[in-house]
């Protein structure tokens, strides 16, 4: 593989995370407008976004095998066609069934691109460099989280239809599509060059702990961010623009944190640092949902964004380091568990909001962060990442 191809594929990975971040994160911003569009209660409307999350889950789960059957370039081209059809469906239909189908298709497209993006980084880079590259790649998720709530707020504040937010997100896939046509992808499966057969390795208890941590982290994070706009407006008296800014502060700090930790992780044991970050994030989220001073929210959420930024990517990195040879199926398994957390976001938090309000939903997400801390702490006793020599300097 040429260096030109490596750089091009790395940029596809960056944009794949930006796409998924944009699709998932804008939900909290457009939810109320979509509910009004379909004349449904917000809590009921939130359930339809389960189709989005189910699409992501299905695509990530199946792509562990499909990557070896269907060439990566062909998958991305097919994804572009699906993206165009989904956005056109959102713009031209008033049917809730069509909306749900389009959300599912958007989820499938996001899941395909994110799993390909993650695989490319774990395939192209090794050891400590893999961890820092994954972190930088994941920072594009938070860049989208910074940019698209601002775009969504601007669109909604001007009384433009909510579906223009998704049209803007589609521009990211245009970039992925163009890059996919310009660069060569690694060949997998039967077409790949056969080297020496590698003995199958047992994944071990560490992978199970990381899988639970990934699920609880994503469920906690997206449940938190998904309801923060409503919590800020209904409980703390902010307007929609201020609420969008609070979400933007989180993702801006998240992005900065990723850049910082992509350098820091080179010098520290990833298991220890992820445990410390999970503890700090749990405490900061507790402070956020219990403060009565609205002016403090932006400062607390910036701290939360910064310290939680490296958790999920470090979980994936630690998972890939549990075996001597990086396994796409292992990485996709942890991604799938994280995606299950995405799918459960509104399934779990929607009924809590309906019965007990926004504060109770945020308290639930806080308890999920506490579980992440516990899993990372227990991982210290069983992790194999040091045994395989992955932590040697490169």
UniProtKB/Swiss-Prot annotation:
Where does the record say this protein resides? Cell inner membrane
Quote the cellular component terms of the Gene Ontology held in the record: plasma membrane
Give the transmembrane region(s).
Answer: 11-31, 51-71, 76-96, 101-121, 135-155, 163-183, 205-225, 245-265, 273-293, 299-319, 333-353, 362-382
Signal peptide range equals none
Keyword Transmembrane helix: yes or no?
yes
Topology in the membrane? Multi-pass membrane protein
State the superkingdom. Bacteria
Supply the PROSITE patterns for this chain.
MFS
Q: What is this protein called?
A: Protein TsgA homolog
Q: Which organism is it from?
A: Erwinia tasmaniensis (strain DSM 17950 / CFBP 7177 / CIP 109463 / NCPPB 4357 / Et1/99)
Q: What is the lineage of its organism?
A: Bacteria, Pseudomonadati, Pseudomonadota, Gammaproteobacteria, Enterobacterales
């Amino acid at each position: 593989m040429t260096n030109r191809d490596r750089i091009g594929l790395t940029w596809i990975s960056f944009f794949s995370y930006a796409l998924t971040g944009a699709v998932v994160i804008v939900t909290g911003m457009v939810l109320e407008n979509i509910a009004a569009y379909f004349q449904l209660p917000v809590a009921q409307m939130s359930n339809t976004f389960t189709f989005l999350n189910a699409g992501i889950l299905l695509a990530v789960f199946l792509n562990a095998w499909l990557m070896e059957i269907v060439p990566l370039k062909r998958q991305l081209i097919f994804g572009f066609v699906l993206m165009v059809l989904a956005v056109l469906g959102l713009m031209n239909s008033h049917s809730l069934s069509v909306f749900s189908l389009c959300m599912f298709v958007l989820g499938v497209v996001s899941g395909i691109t994110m799993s390909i993006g993650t695989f490319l980084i774990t395939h192209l880079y090794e050891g400590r460099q893999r961890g820092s590259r994954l972190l930088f790649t994941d920072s594009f998720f938070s860049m989208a989280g910074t940019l698209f709530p601002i775009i969504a707020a601007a669109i909604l504040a001007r009384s433009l239809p909510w579906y223009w937010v998704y049209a803007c997100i589609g521009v990211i896939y245009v970039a992925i599509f163009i890059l996919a046509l310009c660069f060569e992808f690694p060949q997998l499966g039967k077409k790949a060059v056969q080297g020496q057969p590698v003995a199958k390795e047992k994944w071990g208890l560490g992978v199970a702990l990381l899988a639970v941590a990934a699920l609880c982290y994503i469920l906690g994070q997206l449940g938190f961010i998904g309801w923060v706009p409503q919590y800020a407006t209904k409980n703390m008296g902010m307007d929609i623009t201020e609420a969008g800014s609070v979400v933007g502060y989180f993702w801006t700090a998240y992005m900065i944190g990723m850049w910082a930790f992509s350098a820091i992780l080179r010098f520290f044991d990833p298991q220890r640092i992820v445990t410390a970050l999970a503890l700090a994030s749990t405490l900061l989220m507790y402070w956020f949902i219990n403060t009565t001073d609205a002016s403090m929210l932006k400062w607390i959420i910036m701290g939360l964004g910064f310290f939680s930024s490296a958790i999920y990517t470090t979980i994936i990195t630690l998972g890939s380091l549990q075996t001597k040879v990086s396994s796409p199926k292992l990485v996709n398994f942890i991604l799938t568990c994280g995606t299950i957390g995405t799918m459960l976001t509104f399934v779990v938090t929607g009924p809590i909001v309906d019965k007990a309000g926004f504060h109770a939903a945020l308290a639930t997400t806080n308890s999920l962060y506490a579980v992440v801390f516990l899993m990372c702490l227990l991982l210290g006793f069983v992790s194999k990442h040091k045994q395989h020599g992955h932590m040697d300097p490169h």
